[in-house]
Amino acid sequence: MKNIEDLIQKAVELQNNGLGTGQIADELNVSRETVTWLLTRSKKEVAAPAPKDISVNWSSIGKSATRLHYISLALCDMVIETLEKTNTEVDVVVGVAASGIPLASMMANELGADFALYHSRKGQDMVQPGQKGTISRNFGSVAGKNCVIVDDVITTGSTTMEVIEQLREMDAKPRAVVVLVDKKGADTIANVPIQSLVRIVRVD
C-alpha cells in the first residue's frame, strides 16, 4: 500500500467482507486505534488526528513459500542464539493466528520441535472481560514445555502479553518471542526476551 488512501480503501474493503476491527488490524499490521481512525476517516466524519502508527506490508515475503522458508531460518537462528544463553531447548513453537502460523510451522520443522497454534482474542470485536485466547487442541500440547512464540508484528505488545499469560496459566514456559517486525521496541515482555528481524523506533 502506497499511501493513506490505499489503507483507508483496504480497511473499508475488509470491513465490508465481514472482518472486525481486530481482524482488520491484524491484516494491515496496524493497531485497532488506527483501524478505527481509518474507518472513521472513510466516512468523511470530523477527523481526529491520526494515531502514531506504522503500517507494515510484508506480503512480498508471505506470498512466497521460498521466502518464508528463508525468513524462518533467520528467525530460528535468533531463537538458537537466545536460548543458548540459558542452555534451554525448544520443545514447542507456538504460532499466533493467523500471520504467525506459516513461519512457526516452518520453524518447528527446522528446530525439531512440536507446533502449537494460538487463537488470539484480538480477532473478536466483542471481547468480554476475562475472555482469553486459546491454544488449539488439534496441534501440539504446551503444558510443562519450553515454548517459543512466533508472530509477524508486535504493535502494542498486548497480543504477545496475552499469549505469554495464557501459556503460563497452562504450566508452559515461554522462553522467547520472535517476530518479523517489532514496532513496540521492547527488549522483553513479561520477562520474556523479544527478538525481531526489524525493530522500528519512532523518532518524534
Curated annotation (Swiss-Prot):
GO terms for biological process: pyrimidine nucleobase biosynthetic process; regulation of gene expression; UMP biosynthetic process. GO terms for molecular function: DNA binding; orotate phosphoribosyltransferase activity. Transmembrane segments: none annotated. SUPFAM superfamilies: PRTase-like. Keywords: DNA-binding, Transcription, Transcription regulation. It holds the Pfam family Pribosyltran. It comes from the Archaea. Contains an N-terminal DNA-binding winged helix-turn-helix domain and a C-terminal regulatory domain (or effector binding domain) resembling phosphoribosyltransferase (PRT) domain. Belongs to the purine/pyrimidine phosphoribosyltransferase family. GfcR subfamily. This is Transcriptional regulator GfcR. The gene is gfcR.
